[in-house]
């Protein structure tokens, strides 16, 4: 038994924790979840459960009803196998080979320098705990574990009709105990490609790298309204304000690592006249203090560095640089519109997530989210106009639908009544500004009744990710009670 497994055994008798410890021990970042999928398949077979896999790679496991519950509606428990691979710049970790190193920090479980994978590892562990249990009461159970949710919802897109028999789907990918979700935002990837021209580094120019790091980052849906800094946009702001006066020539812009994570770090390599280096140092320091004044209450660990950099490639031409920097500085980011119908919920947003530089092009990958297709289309149009003005190409891909709330949902009413019966108050019924797979499941299974719930997870998609221990116990209590209260199938 690992150190973590021994440690969490002291938390409670909750069967979720041993499964989560095992999940953490098997690398499973998006696009590299095969080892964990195979482990789960082999484990399920050892339990005598029926296991199937579709051509996309999704895993399906069936468990018969417990005695006396055979006449209940079938329930599909659903989670995704993959996790977001994010680490601090100074953390040495290969997500395809190295296990996550979780530990207990007071009331929370978190990880050493990396994302924890509680999103959606806790939900996945709850599905396995139901399959393993010989004690809880339930009707016919199916477990659906999808692949590649975080990097493109590949598994949900690939789900075909005829694979699931259940009437009700319980999605475990929500991140606030006390809230139950009945709707979510849709989204689309938007990638700019700027074709760039380069020329020789001017005589007398030296290299410097501007580094901005230490931002909180986080989930580009759930955290987009919190006012956190976007490293890509903050660096663009400095370049737009000072490149001309300092004669800065751009060599490389690199920032962010995932379209659905608010970028925490950005790195910009420039060439400039040696006589302007001291002025650059002054202005960059002054800009850092400005950002701390603006964002300091939210971004308590924001830091910048200016380092000498040996130049090994040419600089962008002045025209190429001007149109790229102007476009990036102009590009909208963050909350576009709040919902008029649901108080406190973001309706439409944009995250300028990842910027990469190659020899002859710069790519900027964004993620648009919206509760309404019309809101998504509006932002698509804004970005298309920006691309046209900047002479860039814009590719829109991977569009996925939102999950429209159903006020008549039977399982929602059952969850609400169950929750109130246990805790004496109703849960908050919510719509989430993030992409749950439920919206995609509605296409092959339009009559499936769905809700989403889970424990409290803070700062998902960032190395600060953590899950609150006591809410995992509450999550399990709710899962057990909900399964026992599934109605008889008509």
Predicted ranges, named:
Residues 162, 228-245, 274-277, 323-329, ...:
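His/Asp/Glu-rich mid-to-C-terminal helical/loop segments that flank catalytic regions of hydrolases
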């Amino acid at each position: 038994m690992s150190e973590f497994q021994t440690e969490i055994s002291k938390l409670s008798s909750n069967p979720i924790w041993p499964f989560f410890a095992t999940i953490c021990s098997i690398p499973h970042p998006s696009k590299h979840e095969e080892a964990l999928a195979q482990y789960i398949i082999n484990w399920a077979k050892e339990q005598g459960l029926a296991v199937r896999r579709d051509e996309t790679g999704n895993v399906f496991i069936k468990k018969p009803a417990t005695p006396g519950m055979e006449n209940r509606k079938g329930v599909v428990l659903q989670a995704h196998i993959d996790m977001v691979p994010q680490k601090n710049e100074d953390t040495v970790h290969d997500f395809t080979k190295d296990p996550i190193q979780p530990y207990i920090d007071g009331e929370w479980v978190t990880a050493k320098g990396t994302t924890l994978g509680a999103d959606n590892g806790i939900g996945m562990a709850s599905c396995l705990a139901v399959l393993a249990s010989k004690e809880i009461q339930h009707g016919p159970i199916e477990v659906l574990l999808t692949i590649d949710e975080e990097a493109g919802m590949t598994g949900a897109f690939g789900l075909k009709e005829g694979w699931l028999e259940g009437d009700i789907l319980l999605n475990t990918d929500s991140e606030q105990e006390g809230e139950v979700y009945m709707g979510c935002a849709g989204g689309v990837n938007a990638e700019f490609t700027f074709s760039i021209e380069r020329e020789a580094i001017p005589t007398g120019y030296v290299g410097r790298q501007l580094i901005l790091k230490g931002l909180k980052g986080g989930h580009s849906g759930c955290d987009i309204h919190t006012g956190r800094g976007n490293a890509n946009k903050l660096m663009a702001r400095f370049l737009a304000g000072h490149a001309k006066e300092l004669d800065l020539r751009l060599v490389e812009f690199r920032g962010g690592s995932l379209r659905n994570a608010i970028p925490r770090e950005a790195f910009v390599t420039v060439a400039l006249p040696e006589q302007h280096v001291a002025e650059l140092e002054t202005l960059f320091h002054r800009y850092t203090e400005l950002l701390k004044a603006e964002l300091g209450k939210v971004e308590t660990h924001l830091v910048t560095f200016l380092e000498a950099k040996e130049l090994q490639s040419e600089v962008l031409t002045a025209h190429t640089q001007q149109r790229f920097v102007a476009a990036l500085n102009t590009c909208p980011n963050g909350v576009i519109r709040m919902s008029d119908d649901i108080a406190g919920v973001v309706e439409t947003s944009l995250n300028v997530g990842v910027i990469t530089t190659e020899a002859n092009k710069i790519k900027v990958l964004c993620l648009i989210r919206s509760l309404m297709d019309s809101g998504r289309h509006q932002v698509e149009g804004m970005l298309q106009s920006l691309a046209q003005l900047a002479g860039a190409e814009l590719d829109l891909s991977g569009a996925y639908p939102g999950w429209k709330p159903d006020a008549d949902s039977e399982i929602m009413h059952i969850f609400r009544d169950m929750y109130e019966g246990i805790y004496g108050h109703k849960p908050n019924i919510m719509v989430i500004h993030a992409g749950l797979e439920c919206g995609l499941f509605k296409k092959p299974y339009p009559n499936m009744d769905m809700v989403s719930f889970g424990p409290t997870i803070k700062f998902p998609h960032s190395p600060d990710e953590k899950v609150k221990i006591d809410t995992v116990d509450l999550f399990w209590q709710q899962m057990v009670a909900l399964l026992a209260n599934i109605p008889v199938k008509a």
